[in-house]
Amino acid sequence: MSDTPLKCTTRHVRIFTATVEDNGELKASSDKLTLDLDPDNEFEWDQPVLAKVQQRFAELVDAAAGTELSDYNLRRIGTDLEGFIRQLLQAGELRYNLGARVLNYSMGLPRTPETL
């Protein structure tokens, strides 16, 4: 494997074929994936919601076991995970961080009981 990790980057999901070293640097890995969720802190993550996303990530990785570790397969996992995050937001389990640096509502305007 090369020294440059493969990566998938969506708006709220980053997946790397790498591990994070003690110094915070990424080290390429042919058998480990690192998940970076919501790097811009657009959402408020409660522990149960975070656990659901991590579980879904594990399911997607398990489903892809035995396939080539390629850009395409990483993008499929990342895109599916991004869709899952959208579902959580639409179901009201995840909410926007109103204290975020920028409020761009990238997954649609916030939903309130009055607008449902």
Swiss-Prot record:
**Major localisation:** membrane
Q: Which GO terms describe its cellular component?
A: plasma membrane-derived thylakoid membrane
List where in the cell it is found.
Answer: Cellular thylakoid membrane
Lipid bilayer topology: Peripheral membrane protein
Enzyme Commission code(s) on record = 7.1.1.-
Swiss-Prot/TrEMBL keywords: Membrane, NAD, NADP, Plastoquinone, Quinone, Thylakoid, Translocase, Transport
**Catalysed reaction per UniProt?**
a plastoquinone + NADH + (n+1) H(+)(in) = a plastoquinol + NAD(+) + n H(+)(out); a plastoquinone + NADPH + (n+1) H(+)(in) = a plastoquinol + NADP(+) + n H(+)(out)
Which molecular function GO terms apply here?
oxidoreductase activity, acting on NAD(P)H, quinone or similar compound as acceptor; quinone binding
UniProt keyword Translocase, yes or no: yes
Instruction: Please name one Pfam family that this protein belongs to.
Output: NdhM
Protein role: NDH-1 shuttles electrons from an unknown electron donor, via FMN and iron-sulfur (Fe-S) centers, to quinones in the respiratory and/or the photosynthetic chain. The immediate electron acceptor for the enzyme in this species is believed to be plastoquinone. Couples the redox reaction to proton translocation, and thus conserves the redox energy in a proton gradient. Cyanobacterial NDH-1 also plays a role in inorganic carbon-concentration.
Q: What is the protein's quaternary organization?
A: NDH-1 can be composed of about 15 different subunits; different subcomplexes with different compositions have been identified which probably have different functions.
Question: What's this protein's family per the entry?
Answer: Belongs to the complex I NdhM subunit family.
Under the heading HAMAP family, the entry gives: NDH1_NDH1M (MF_01352)
Per its record, how is this protein called by name? NAD(P)H-quinone oxidoreductase subunit M
Gene name tied to this protein? ndhM
